[in-house]
UniProtKB/Swiss-Prot annotation:
Name of the protein this chain belongs to: Protein-export protein SecB
Gene from which this protein is expressed: secB
InterPro entries: SecB, SecB-like_sf
One Gene Ontology molecular-function label: unfolded protein binding
Subcellular location: Cytoplasm
Main location: cytoplasm
Gene Ontology CC: one annotated term: cytoplasm
Species this protein is from: Cupriavidus pinatubonensis (strain JMP 134 / LMG 1197) (Cupriavidus necator (strain JMP 134))
């Protein structure tokens, strides 16, 4: 191979999953064993959040956090919080594409692992499995962008400093 071919390959966008792992998980059953005697159907609340951080040049950790709180009447049956993480090698990606990659593609890869781990711990705790529904991380990402733009507008800046997925500056 010539030096020119090597340089061209080195400049190509590169995305690789280095590792997927369960970073943290907790289960609380504050009203057990009495809660198992309740006959009323439980209410379920689910919250999902995404965070990303750069570990070193081109290496990023993305964490998808899921919290499931189940109550019978006003008593908490259980609360599960899990942090499913992944380490991603991302190089030669244009800056305007990096944030959507970290906020959409990486969480989409991690979420099935999070769902499985949460369902497993709930079942092992003696409760009926709760299967979390799919999440459209693109819509979630766009909602966060919109909220950030509205916050910037409220602060009074003409240029929010937010870069849209197409690379343009967000303005109000």
């Amino acid at each position: 191979m010539s030096d020119q071919q090597n340089t061209q390959q080195e400049d190509q966008p590169f995305f690789n999953i280095q590792r997927v792992y369960l970073k943290d998980m907790s289960l609380e059953q504050p009203n057990s064993p009495g809660i198992f005697l309740e006959s009323e159907a439980p209410s379920v609340e689910v919250q999902v959040n995404v965070a990303a951080s750069q570990l070193q040049e081109g290496i990023f950790e993305v964490v998808v956090t899921g919290t499931v709180t189940t109550k019978v009447q006003e008593k908490v049956a259980f609360l599960v919080e899990a942090h499913q993480a992944g380490i991603f090698d991302i190089r030669n990606v244009p800056v305007e594409q990096l944030d959507p990659l970290l906020g959409i593609a990486c969480p989409t890869i991690l979420y099935p692992y999070l769902r499985g781990n949460i369902a497993d711990v709930i079942t092992r705790a003696g409760f009926q499995a709760i299967h979390l529904s799919e999440i459209n991380f693109q819509a979630l990402y766009e909602q966060r962008l919109q909220a950030a733009m509205e916050e910037a507008q409220a602060a009074g800046g003409a240029n929010s400093g937010i870069v849209m997925p197409d690379g343009s500056q967000a303005r109000h």
